Amino acid sequence: MRIAVVGMGKIGLPLAVHYARGGHTVVGVDVNPGVVALINEGVEPFPGEAHLAEYLPPLASSGALRATTEYAEAIPGADTVVMVVPLVVDNESRPDFRVMDAATRSMAAHLTPGTLVSYETTLPVGTTRGRYKPLIEEVSGLIEGCDFDVVFSPERVLTGRVFADLARYPKLVGGLSEAGEAHGVSFYEAVLSFDERDDLPRPNGVWPMGGAEAAEMAKLAETTYRDVNIGLANQFARYADAIGINVARVIEACNSQPYSHIHRPGIAVGGHCIPVYPRLYLAGDPDATIVSAARAANADMPAYAVSRASALLGSLKGLRVALLGATYRGGVKETAFSGVFGVVDALREAGAQVSVHDPLYADDELAAFGWDAYHLGEPVDVAIIQADHAAYRNLVPADLPGVRLLVDGRAITSPEAWVGTSRITVGGGSAPAC
């Protein structure tokens, strides 16, 4: 097959590589000429994706995968076009369709009959049918269901382990017609293989959803569930702090019962998915008060963690605070919706002298965000762990000379290593005065 992948980002490029490794001819489209050049040189544009640096070079050198900035070089004659372009939310938490709209228009201008168009980017319910079907028809002059088919098939992978996740989870496909959905199912059955899983209600593989809207909602629901669950865990944690008990023991006890699946509380919920997709869900169901309350609770956690430090120390004004971890999660060089931004803002508002450390970022990269760089071993009054990098698990007071308080926002350090120095976690209960 000839496959075009629109969007050569942290999901799109591994997808393109996977298809090419399966023997298909793949052309990737991206608006960034630097990314395109690196891909064509066989160089991984964003390190950190398992196996990508190994898989990409032979595909680029053989021509099985190439990248371009020109839709005209990728779309005409493609059997399938896979859209993996970011959809973000604006400052008022509304979906910002501009990038996806532009990509869809550019793709549609070169669409040829017989093509399957699959949207893998997470979209609000109804967007595939109500927004992109008519837009493609308007620009291309073709008719969906006659000249081409559109399906929604959400990516369900995590950056850093895309290749493994493609086989791990069922591939959901929802079409705009029965025949169109069958077209989508046929494509994904041809390009994917799946792990055997005894825990699923039916065999792992491509799962038809009976319509694009069901597939759209499934992706939003699974991620919104996680945000709501974390929001509940964070509420439990705040109450545990107020009454002086350790919420981790409570959650461990609850989850020993098979119907309880409480997530872990923490200093922040970040990344491209969990903080964003509940907002996309709310775009279609604005009266979902449970969802909006959980989102608000999670968004407040960075400020809450700083407030606990301030309460224990009396004030943070003038104190040297080292914020450990800029990324939204450990081991991944990505700051999308990271808690670092909220924590820095709250610390500056409290009058603290803030510096940031992250093992994945050089000093100049941290400076580009407007942050002073902190280096382990430099004097500090307070340290706050924001990202669960492996390098922080074995931290001891000697790594942070003069530290009076550690706020372990991810509960990854050893309490025994901090005997004699105040250490608190989110939901860890009361702590001695510093």
Residue map of PLM features:
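Structural/interface elements that position substrates and couple domains in central-metabolism enzymes
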Residues: 1-434
